[in-house]
Amino acid sequence: MSIMSYNGGAVMAMKGKQCVAIAADRRFGVQAQMVTTDFQKIFPMGDRLYIGLAGLATDVQTVSQRLKFRLNLYELKEGRQIKPKTFMSMVSNLLYERRFGPYYIEPVIAGLDPKTFEPFICSLDLIGCPMVTEDFVVSGTCSEQMYGMCESLWEPDMEPEDLFETISQAMLNAVDRDAVSGMGVVVQVIEKDKITTRTLKARMD
């Protein structure tokens, strides 16, 4: 069994029209054994910037804390909010530093540029190689199912409510086909003037 699927989990991000959405499941388990159903996998890294971490649960918490530390140092030094692309480089550097004994996580970043409010999404592998796309990114144990759902449902330039519906349906249907993820979904829709957080009920078996 791969260490990446030891705890299970699924994270996804999508672009819309002047908005982005990021979603993650809530399950934390050890292989087939369930531990909790409210595990945090999406972390705020700015006013309109979020990171979702799928992979080994211990590394999820370690990396989120180390990123917060580096982010605070950056904002103190620069005196401004970090741009999503710069934050992607920060995450990439953190992961690549540990390439010979990596953090077993695959991050997904979603946010809006603090000045232009341009939507940005990307995913990285466990040694920090980034992939920036214009539609959607996925990470976790049911990535094949998530890709299938996203390719079926995603459309360009969706309004925030349509984007929420699309990412919710894609996520709920993908995690239903994976034994080690699910137990509810948290969705954040990031817009220019507000962030909407919704918790969705899912199958609990």
Swiss-Prot record:
Q: Which CDD domains does the UniProt entry name for this protein? A: proteasome_beta_type_3
Locations listed in the record: Cytoplasm; Nucleus
Could you tell me the Gene Ontology terms of the biological process aspect for this record? Answer: proteasome-mediated ubiquitin-dependent protein catabolic process
Among its keywords, does the record have Cell wall biogenesis/degradation?
Answer: no
- Please indicate which superkingdom the organism of origin belongs to: Eukaryota
Is S-adenosyl-L-methionine among the key words of this record? no
Gene3D superfamilies under this entry? Glutamine Phosphoribosylpyrophosphate, subunit 1, domain 1
**Gene Ontology cellular component terms for the protein in this record:** cytoplasm; nucleus; proteasome core complex; proteasome core complex, beta-subunit complex
Record keywords, A-Z: Cytoplasm, Nucleus, Proteasome
What quaternary structure, including any partners, is listed in this protein's UniProt entry? The 26S proteasome consists of a 20S proteasome core and two 19S regulatory subunits. The 20S proteasome core is composed of 28 subunits that are arranged in four stacked rings, resulting in a barrel-shaped structure. The two end rings are each formed by seven alpha subunits, and the two central rings are each formed by seven beta subunits. The catalytic chamber with the active sites is on the inside of the barrel.
Q: Which family is this sequence assigned to?
A: Belongs to the peptidase T1B family.
General function of this protein: Non-catalytic component of the proteasome, a multicatalytic proteinase complex which is characterized by its ability to cleave peptides with Arg, Phe, Tyr, Leu, and Glu adjacent to the leaving group at neutral or slightly basic pH. The proteasome has an ATP-dependent proteolytic activity.
Write the protein's name.
Proteasome subunit beta type-3
Top-level taxonomy: Eukaryota, Metazoa, Chordata, Craniata, Vertebrata
> Gene name on record?
psmb3
